[in-house]
Amino acid sequence: MIDLRSDTVTRPSRAMLEAMMAAPVGDDVYGDDPTVNALQDYAAELSGKEAAIFLPTGTQANLVALLSHCERGEEYIVGQAAHNYLFEAGGAAVLGSIQPQPIDAAADGTLPLDKVAMKIKPDDIHFARTKLLSLENTHNGKVLPREYLKEAWEFTRERNLALHVDGARIFNAVVAYGCELKEITQYCDSFTICLSKGLGTPVGSLLVGNRDYIKRAIRWRKMTGGGMRQSGILAAAGIYALKNNVARLQEDHDNAAWMAEQLREAGADVMRQDTNMLFVRVGEENAAALGEYMKARNVLINASPIVRLVTHLDVSREQLAEVAAHWRAFLAR
């Protein structure tokens, strides 16, 4: 089966599984798992931050990030289509009494800082206290302009706001920039990394920041049910991914660009391609039929009027050629 629904469908390689089986473990709730500690230290080293914490999921990592920045009755400014606003069940509001203040992102995925400034609440008892600006990089595949990262950082310093980056696919951004992680994470107070998307681990995310911040995050992780015991088996996959699967993300980007060109040549309405994602408009009338057509040919896609295709380490160029041929045949019916 060729699965292009998301890069969350990736499976651990044989080498990754061997690293997991060989991992020394301990009780991480006590801080005694050497492999978890090694992963956290390595993430902090790569990013130039003081500390990191390993969590089961990206949703929990974002939730803990917000809970560790904001008190009850405070707010974070966030993109209208950001994952930690739109797709995480309102966790910060439900569990933390943290108010989101969404704004529309610009076409390049940035939150215009003049619009952000207009949403910062005055010091008045009628309003929630604005505490945090939350960005997403990459955002729906789009890499935020590097100069914007510095501008947003300086903006938040001037206004006494914290800056968090949902970096579920931050290494896709790193590869696209052609830089080291720490060159961009210097411009945020905290950020997350999802290990189970393009990096190919079966489970796990990281939250990275300064030592005091991560100390608060450890407490919130425990309170929200994320304290794990012998989780070094999972952390070993993360170490393997960070050491072996980052540079190869360029292959996913190249495959997505190649696939976009193939579909354009076939007559498909390719709206855009960024990093490892491409978006194809098929229309309401064709969405279900295309999904069924592809599934019958062992291809899984999200059947919707605008189809998002995501390339990853478990899909080869040869398999993409098969998908392009099927798409061409569908359009020629």
UniProtKB/Swiss-Prot annotation:
<comment type="subunit">
    <text>Homotetramer.</text>
</comment>
<dbReference type="GO" id="GO:0030170">
    <property type="term" value="F:pyridoxal phosphate binding"/>
</dbReference>
<dbReference type="InterPro" id="IPR015424">
    <property type="entry name" value="PyrdxlP-dep_Trfase"/>
</dbReference>
<dbReference type="GO" id="GO:0005829">
    <property type="term" value="C:cytosol"/>
</dbReference>
<dbReference type="GO" id="GO:0050179">
    <property type="term" value="F:phenylserine aldolase activity"/>
</dbReference>
<dbReference type="InterPro" id="IPR015421">
    <property type="entry name" value="PyrdxlP-dep_Trfase_major"/>
</dbReference>
<dbReference type="GO" id="GO:0006545">
    <property type="term" value="P:glycine biosynthetic process"/>
</dbReference>
<dbReference type="Pfam" id="PF01212">
    <property type="entry name" value="Beta_elim_lyase"/>
</dbReference>
<dbReference type="GO" id="GO:0008732">
    <property type="term" value="F:L-allo-threonine aldolase activity"/>
</dbReference>
<protein>
    <recommendedName>
        <fullName>Low specificity L-threonine aldolase</fullName>
        <ecNumber>4.1.2.48</ecNumber>
    </recommendedName>
</protein>
<feature type="modified residue" description="N6-(pyridoxal phosphate)lysine">
    <location>
        <position position="197"/>
    </location>
</feature>
<keyword id="KW-0663">Pyridoxal phosphate</keyword>
<comment type="function">
    <text>Catalyzes the cleavage of L-allo-threonine and L-threonine to glycine and acetaldehyde. L-threo-phenylserine and L-erythro-phenylserine are also good substrates.</text>
</comment>
<dbReference type="InterPro" id="IPR015422">
    <property type="entry name" value="PyrdxlP-dep_Trfase_small"/>
</dbReference>
<dbReference type="InterPro" id="IPR001597">
    <property type="entry name" value="ArAA_b-elim_lyase/Thr_aldolase"/>
</dbReference>
<dbReference type="GO" id="GO:0042802">
    <property type="term" value="F:identical protein binding"/>
</dbReference>
<dbReference type="GO" id="GO:0006567">
    <property type="term" value="P:threonine catabolic process"/>
</dbReference>
<keyword id="KW-0456">Lyase</keyword>
<dbReference type="InterPro" id="IPR023603">
    <property type="entry name" value="Low_specificity_L-TA-like"/>
</dbReference>
<comment type="similarity">
    <text>Belongs to the threonine aldolase family.</text>
</comment>
